[in-house]
């Protein structure tokens, strides 16, 4: 069987994702579509609107054959580390291709620019440092440095272009046999906050925003199974997962932590701990808090990731230990259909990473130890007994079928 990999968050699964799955299968003629999906928190440092199990169920209904977990140490990271973890999992699963959505739509510029980054790494890094010292934020410095070392390069100001670039770069660095492919995104942009009037494809950002107001507003922008899954979760748990729900927990953490303790948290650098400590005293919402802390050097996304690390109590030392090899240490299926099950049966004897379907077998793994803390933090907003039930689901739920 031929497998193609995709890297996803499905926060939530919408019509644009459905198009991506369909076009991926069409473009690659793959027998099995494998999705590596972020678990409880996303790459931009946000709680997923519903848990991974619900999102995995949406994925199966949308045409994915096998959903595997991208654990927290790679999921809540810069694009580079996010890609390293995802590619290592797809490589372990013997995927022949990786197909991602992008604003560009052609794979050649991704390959050319990725090769430039790999083979001129030191030159690029030095240029980035020069721009950062001038007070420019990392994302902008990265783009400027890339232009300096190779004028005819990919537009990395677009979020899906930058992710795609790092997928290709990770493939090269890991010497993987995976062949990268890309599909041009249609209609909605990644950060659009409004729902389009004359189309049925909207960004996940706008869908999450309007779910806070009315479920009915988003029905035309998501597959029916997604809509039903969202409604069922809201009816059962009486909440969506978003930063405002977690803000009291974050505030408690910051108020009771010493500055020295905050300094140990992943991604905390350059004295930002003092701004965090000062701003939390008067902040009455997560949005107000981040607005008070944000600087030119610290983007909203980076601050959200820092806040996620504070909430989950993940330190620099823990992260460094977990991802030192730049590769995942296990493959954890979350959901599969018959095609996905048959594919796993075919490849599992040859896999170099353990295939784990029960969390108790990963208790001593550094990556899973962080993933476990993230799950515990994620379910903490739920009332009892729902909170305890959600924790048990993490440890006992077999892959959905």
Swiss-Prot record:
Cellular localization per UniProt: Cytoplasm
GO cellular component, one term: cytoplasm
A GO term for molecular function: tRNA binding
Record key words, sorted: ATP-binding, Cytoplasm, Ligase, Nucleotide-binding, RNA-binding, tRNA processing, tRNA-binding
One GO-annotated biological process of the protein: tRNA modification
InterPro entries, per database record: Rossmann-like_a/b/a_fold, tRNA(Met)_cyd_acetate_ligase
Record's catalysed reaction(s): cytidine(34) in elongator tRNA(Met) + acetate + ATP = N(4)-acetylcytidine(34) in elongator tRNA(Met) + AMP + diphosphate
Record: residues binding ATP: 7-20, 101, 160, 185-186
Main location: cytoplasm
Family annotation (Pfam families): HIGH_NTase1 (PF05636)
Keyword Cell inner membrane: no
Source domain of life: Bacteria
Enzyme Commission code(s) on record: 6.3.4.-
Similarity section: Belongs to the TmcAL family.
Entry function: Catalyzes the formation of N(4)-acetylcytidine (ac(4)C) at the wobble position of elongator tRNA(Met), using acetate and ATP as substrates. First activates an acetate ion to form acetyladenylate (Ac-AMP) and then transfers the acetyl group to tRNA to form ac(4)C34.
HAMAP family per record: TmcAL
Protein's recorded name: tRNA(Met) cytidine acetate ligase
Organism: Anoxybacillus flavithermus (strain DSM 21510 / WK1)
Lineage of origin: Bacteria, Bacillati, Bacillota, Bacilli, Bacillales
């Amino acid at each position: 069987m031929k497998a193609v990999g995709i890297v996803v968050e499905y926060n939530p699964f919408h019509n644009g994702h459905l198009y991506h799955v369909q076009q991926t299968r069409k473009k690659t003629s793959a027998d099995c579509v494998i999705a590596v999906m972020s678990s409880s928190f996303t790459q931009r440092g946000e709680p997923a609107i519903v848990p991974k199990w619900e999102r995995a169920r949406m994925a199966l209904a949308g045409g994915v054959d096998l959903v595997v977990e991208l654990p927290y140490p790679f999921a809540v990271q810069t694009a580079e580390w996010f890609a390293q973890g995802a590619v290592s999992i797809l490589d372990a699963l013997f995927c022949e291709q990786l197909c991602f959505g992008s604003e560009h739509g052609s794979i050649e510029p991704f390959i050319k620019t990725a090769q430039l980054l790999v083979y001129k790494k030191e030159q690029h890094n030095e240029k980035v440092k020069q721009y950062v010292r001038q007070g420019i934020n990392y994302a902008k410095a990265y783009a400027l440095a890339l232009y300096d070392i190779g004028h005819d390069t990919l537009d990395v100001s677009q979020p899906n272009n930058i992710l795609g670039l790092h997928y290709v770069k990770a493939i090269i660095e890991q010497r993987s046999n995976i062949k990268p492919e890309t599909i041009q995104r249609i209609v909605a942009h990644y950060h659009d906050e409004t729902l389009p009037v004359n189309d049925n494809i909207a960004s996940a950002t706008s869908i999450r925003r309007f779910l806070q107001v009315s479920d009915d507003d988003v029905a035309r922008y998501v597959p029916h199974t997604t809509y039903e899954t969202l409604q069922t979760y809201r009816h059962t748990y009486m909440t969506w997962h978003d930063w405002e729900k977690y803000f009291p927990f974050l505030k408690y953490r910051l108020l009771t932590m010493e500055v020295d303790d905050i300094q140990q948290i992943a991604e905390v650098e350059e004295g930002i701990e003092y701004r965090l400590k000062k701003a939390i005293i008067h902040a009455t919402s997560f949005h107000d808090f981040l607005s008070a802390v944000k600087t030119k050097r610290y983007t909203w996304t980076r601050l959200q990731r820092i806040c996620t690390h504070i909430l989950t109590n993940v330190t620099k030392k823990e992260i460094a230990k977990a991802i030192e090899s730049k590769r995942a240490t296990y493959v954890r299926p979350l959901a599969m259909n018959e095609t996905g099950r048959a594919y796993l049966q075919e490849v599992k004897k040859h896999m170099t990473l353990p295939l784990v379907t029960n969390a108790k077998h990963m208790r001593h793994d550094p990556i899973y130890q962080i993933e476990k803390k993230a799950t515990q933090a994620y379910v903490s907003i739920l009332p009892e007994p729902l909170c305890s039930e959600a924790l048990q689901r993490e440890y006992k739920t077999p892959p959905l079928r």
